[in-house]
């Protein structure tokens, strides 16, 4: 098969996906996840700022941000408990 023919088929399928609206669903999911991760990071910053006087410090990295973003307040509480008693 000619490369032009293959590129044309792929381009046609991409245009069909955009016209049908199904390409927006994964982008929406990625956006929601990104907002949750940012909110989790901000919550961890607040915990580190206000918990600093109590000796509470949770490192901010991808794993802790994901846990606090997805689980919310219970996730942050779990991270603090793990940090204080296990590590």
UniProtKB/Swiss-Prot annotation:
All ranges on the Cytoplasmic side of the membrane: 24-36
NCBIfam families: spore_BofA
Annotated positions binding Zn(2+): 57
GO molecular function, one term: metal ion binding
Keywords of this entry: Membrane, Metal-binding, Sporulation, Transmembrane, Transmembrane helix, Zinc
Subunit relationships: Forms a complex with SpoIVFA and SpoIVFB localized in the mother cell membrane surrounding the forespore.
Entry GO terms, CC: membrane
Membrane topology of this protein: Multi-pass membrane protein
Cellular location(s): Forespore outer membrane
Forespore intermembrane space topological segments: 1-2, 58-87
TM ranges: 3-23, 37-57
Single biological process term from Gene Ontology: sporulation resulting in formation of a cellular spore
Stated role: Involved in the mediation of the intercompartmental coupling of pro-sigma K processing to events in the forespore. Inhibits SpoIVFB-processing activity until a signal has been received from the forespore. Could inhibit SpoIVFB metalloprotease activity by coordinating a zinc in the SpoIVFB active site, preventing access of a water molecule and the sequence of pro-sigma K, which are necessary for peptide bond hydrolysis to produce sigma-K.
Protein name (Swiss-Prot/TrEMBL): Sigma-K factor-processing regulatory protein BofA
